Amino acid sequence: MGDIQTAKPHVFLPRGSEHALTGVPAHLGPYTLRGSSTTSDVSYDNSLGTKGQTLADDVLAQCDGDVGQVSTWFSGIAPGRFTLFIDPGTFGAYHASCAATELHLAAFDGNNGDLVNMLNVAEVDEVFMAVQNAGWDCGASHGEGLSRVLAAERYPAQLDGFASGAAWLDTSDRPDWVSMTEPTDTDYVSIGCAALFINFLCHQLGYSLTAIVAAGAPTLAQVYTNLTAKTDAFVAFSTLLQRRFPLGTPSGLTTDNPFPIL
């Protein structure tokens, strides 16, 4: 499968793993190709045994529908085939670059196919961002936020340890990662702000995910302006959240979507 790559991979890390991988890990292998679908070739690490087979079957059963839905959100673009590897571990998921279609998905305990499918959506949608080339950057906070929102839309029950909204709500100052974009996909504070803001656009203001994706820009503030023609993105967002979650009080939020707030 090749040697360790020195370039920083693009990752989908569970909370508490914000220490980004410094290089793509050596592929464990050997792998068994379990099967191929219309969109994807799915293999599992042999060390996973029958659990790997079952997880691969779960992914094969869902990946075409998942890729099809992501394609709909991205207005029908097609990035080509995906090569999926299910690996032992709890690292989340990664690929070598935003455009890389070789995706590595963690098996976790080997018993939750929907979790692995959520990881797949989170990496697949980043490839679509790269192909779309409209401003969403999978290696930056706003692109990572979009990745998580889309993955949770497909598998809402699996967000769990990947929820990021509280990381931003529970800071002392709630920094403005709407007007600015942080050039990392591993800071749960900026990612949490981004995920909350995208859900604000969708579930508070009523814009479809397809419209939000199409409004891509280098900052979420510009996405908001593209959609609304207004320039008060962070003020409107932060003022609304302050009403529900007063600054300085633990939010208790366990999802990335507290909207609508009435």
Locate each region found by the language model:
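Active-site-proximal structural scaffolding
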Residues: 63, 140-143, 190-194, 205, ...
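Alpha-helical scaffold elements that line and support the substrate/ligand-binding pocket
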Residues: 123-132, 147, 190-208
